[in-house]
From Swiss-Prot:
PANTHER family hit by this protein: FERREDOXIN-LIKE, FERREDOXIN-LIKE PROTEIN FIXX-RELATED
Native source organism of the sequence: Salmonella typhi
NCBIfam families, alphabetized: PRK15449.1 (NF011993)
Keywords assigned by UniProt, alphabetized: 4Fe-4S, Electron transport, Iron, Iron-sulfur, Metal-binding, Transport
InterPro entries: Fd_FixX (IPR012206)
Similarity field: Belongs to the bacterial-type ferredoxin family. FixX subfamily.
This protein's name: Ferredoxin-like protein FixX
Gene: fixX
Cited Gene3D superfamilies: 3.30.70.20
Source taxon at top rank: Bacteria
GO MF assignments: 4 iron, 4 sulfur cluster binding; iron ion binding
Record's function text: Could be part of an electron transfer system required for anaerobic carnitine reduction. Could be a 3Fe-4S cluster-containing protein.
Length: 95
């Protein structure tokens, strides 16, 4: 019998090379609140976090580059979404 897969453990083996000089995702100055709520629930990496005061905090480090937030929030919450520059971003590792 096999043991259940722990997603956090599987994601933990991925390597992230974060481009500190050029973020590949930028939120709008005044993003739509409902769109942010959707992103909080939809992001598989959990990068959109609701704070105690109701605001949403976002950090692009740890992005899986899946495009979920691009599809759901490009016109309403995001100013920019593009893949990271060459040699930057996520390197998926299986283990």
């Amino acid at each position: 019998m096999t043991s259940p897969v722990n997603v956090d453990v599987k994601l933990g083996v991925n390597k992230f090379n974060v481009d500190e000089d050029s973020p590949h995702i930028i939120l709008k100055t005044d993003p739509d609140k409902q769109a942010l709520e959707v992103l909080v629930k939809a992001c598989p990496a959990g990068l959109y976090k609701k704070q105690d005061d109701g605001s949403v905090r976002f950090d692009y480090a740890g992005c899986l580059e899946c495009g979920t937030c691009r599809i759901l929030g490009l016109d309403t919450a995001l100013e920019k979404w593009e893949y990271p520059r060459g040699t930057f971003g996520v390197e998926f590792r299986y283990g």
